[in-house]
Amino acid sequence: KYTADLCGKNALVAKVLHAPHAHALVKSINTEAALKVEGVEAVFTCFDVPKNYFPTAGHPWSTDIDHQDIADRLLLTDHVRFWGDDVAVVVATDELAAKKALREIEVEYEELPFVLDVQEAMREGAPQLHEGFEHNVLGHSSIRTGNYAEAIKEPGLIKVEGWYDTPTVQHCHIENHNCWAYME
């Protein structure tokens, strides 16, 4: 069985409203019409939840504070940093009601400039996505092996310089991301 198979018959369903902008500030959210949809139990927005930051990956690298994932995410955010960022959530008695209510939520955004190139995003004056992190760099890590000072003295050494990147890698789950909880 998968996690979604374990939900009780009386379980409520939550659906998230994703921002349609690459970079924006949420100025206001009107949920009145969404709350009137039959079956809707609650609607929460980025203005309703506390600003408790957590790491994107959701786990620390180690117990060493200098080697942990950066707490840069919020459950719901008023500073949209990518297309699809989470700004509101609907809780309803079934999936259909939740989806209908999502369409009724009115969000006013202030669109902000954005860039699509990593190197451009790190340049001086680039749109800032992460408050408090200069040039949009949240963290830096490197791997060093050998002794560079000695190796550079070696005759015939070939020096290679350039910008190298790797594609995003994501392990693929057999099921969709989901969770369920209950109160005793």
What are these regions (language model features)?
Residues 1-138, 162:
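Flexible, low-hydrophobicity surface segments
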